[in-house]
Amino acid sequence: MTDSTTHDALPAWQTRDHLDDPVIGELRNRFGPEAFTVQPTRTGMPVVWVKPDQLLEVMTFLRKQPKPYVMLFDLHGVDERLRTHRDGLPAADFSVFYHLISIERNRDIMLKVALSEKDLHVPTATKVFPNANWYERETWEMFGITFDGHPHLSRIMMPQTWEGHPLRKDYPARATEFDPFVLTKQKEDLEMEALTFKPEDWGMKRGTENEDFMFLNLGPNHPSAHGAFRIILQLDGEEIVDCVPDIGYHHRGAEKMGERQSWHSYIPYTDRIEYLGGCVNEMPYVLAVEKLAGIKVPDRVDTIRVMLSELFRINSHLLYISTFIQDVGAMTPVFFAFTDRQKIYDLVEAITGFRMHPAWFRIGGVAHDLPRGWDRLLREFLEWMPKRLDSYVKAALKNSILKGRSVGVASYNAKEALEWGVTGAGLRATGIEFDVRKWRPYSGYENFDFEVPVGDGNSDCYTRVMLKVEELRQSLRILEQCLNNMPEGPFKADHPLTTPPPKERTLQHIETLITHFLQVSWGPVMPANESFQMIEATKGINSYYLTSDGSTMSYRTRVRTPSFAHLQQIPAVIRGSLVSDLIVYLGSIDFVMSDVDR
């Protein structure tokens, strides 16, 4: 076993509180040295508390800097009322945080606003970052914080008839704390009435002087919607004048669950955030918890985690590529792709014991070591897959009909992608080579040799799918390096917060058994702090922002998923296109609704 390490031993870019980050000096030069409170955390970025009346001015300043913060990566809230470890922070009953990214600096900053329960108002950020729209709606819905000036502050995850704000600390977290649910005929009629679309509520006109618009309800059970997703189309003939995406049908309260599960027992829930990603989704969570605990895992653990993540990346990409081809009209490739995916599942099952949702990563390591014969199975897959991928490209993706349906369709540039918070292949198709595995390596990715495919400046449906093909080839390349260079050593860090003590130690020191009993029964107690980890997931950047209050459970678990941002962008991209183009566009985004709704 390796020795446990301290917080300072982790990679510098991940752990420095960035109190010396140049942006802090820039802000103080512009707004004065007393304008902010800088909060030390383990997020790896400067965390700055600003006053509500200065928020928009600060955000605009950051966006117009020579190396600007061009993307609003995340926005949400925290109920601070029960938090005990708040020394040095502004008094607050609630807070709102804004996570901004500068591509040119490859740096982030988090702005926080402290709010009193008597005055839960903050100005909307939609005039600075248009993608703040959905994030503010969800924050209002979950916490009751009003964003003054928001164009349509309404529920987004919960039914319109829902009462209360679920992420408040005084809101029940378990079904047993509610009265039994009874669906009467009257309540059913009320719920159905609430689903009726009223164009005027969204600033839409029912028609012009000469003709009426048609409103088409696509979903939430349409096969081309890729899940329980509804989108209302305002049509002039077959042309889309405008549209309104309607999400939330797959919402399961994943962030609320994080407040009622131990640090360890929450791992299975991470698999189901994006149910095709498997171990990929476990990665940011366990890395964020390891930052809180100050754990450095062995090299073997890093490499095993990378190997499992890339297997699931290939698995997800194969489904995406084949269903995209199916959406355009070709049925055969999807059946071939499932044969390939079965080989991956056989390999994953041999290693982890499970298929889609292994829940196999652990805080400080993995559940168990690699089994005998794993290398043979991986080698057979690496010999099999390249030829199959070539056949998909030759037989389907270079087909003139497919290209005619997808080239130039649903196109956007880099500026538009950044405005809407697009990440993953959609952003890289615009020519921006932002891949977290390269730009902000985690779990040893800096030790692997692979390329980041990029587009030529415009992200259209065809470019997005072809980039995924190239990403799949690079994942095969990474897997080959895992096969040939798997380090020796333990599969867990020797750390009291995560790993049972060796038997010989328990025979000498009774305290080790007491500690082990508490860890297993109540769960480990993580130091009070905040941590953050983003990763390059299958559909874009996925991240976990964890707040520990020195307890066995997370005080606040914020899950930022790429698909949420990507669906918000749909109206801006598809206006003026045909309904048939929308179907191809939806197929090119690569999303599942569990990733959107959490």
UniProtKB/Swiss-Prot annotation:
Assigned EC number: 7.1.1.-
Signal peptide: none
InterPro entries, sorted: NADH_DH_suC, NADH_DH_suCD, NADH_Q_OxRdtase_suD, NADH_quin_OxRdtase_su_C/D-like, NADH_UbQ_OxRdtase_30kDa_su, NADH_UbQ_OxRdtase_49kDa_CS, NDH1_su_D/H, NiFe-Hase_large
Reactions it catalyzes: a quinone + NADH + 5 H(+)(in) = a quinol + NAD(+) + 4 H(+)(out)
Single GO cellular component term: plasma membrane
Keyword Calcium belongs to the record: no
PROSITE patterns hit by this protein: COMPLEX1_49K
Alphabetized GO MF terms: NAD binding; NADH dehydrogenase (ubiquinone) activity; NADH:ubiquinone reductase (non-electrogenic) activity; quinone binding
Subcellular location(s) of the protein: Cell inner membrane
Membrane topology annotation: Peripheral membrane protein
Subunit-structure text: NDH-1 is composed of 13 different subunits. Subunits NuoB, CD, E, F, and G constitute the peripheral sector of the complex.
Similarity field: In the N-terminal section; belongs to the complex I 30 kDa subunit family. In the C-terminal section; belongs to the complex I 49 kDa subunit family.
Task performed by this protein: NDH-1 shuttles electrons from NADH, via FMN and iron-sulfur (Fe-S) centers, to quinones in the respiratory chain. The immediate electron acceptor for the enzyme in this species is believed to be ubiquinone. Couples the redox reaction to proton translocation (for every two electrons transferred, four hydrogen ions are translocated across the cytoplasmic membrane), and thus conserves the redox energy in a proton gradient.
Listed name of the protein: NADH-quinone oxidoreductase subunit C/D
Gene it is expressed from: nuoC
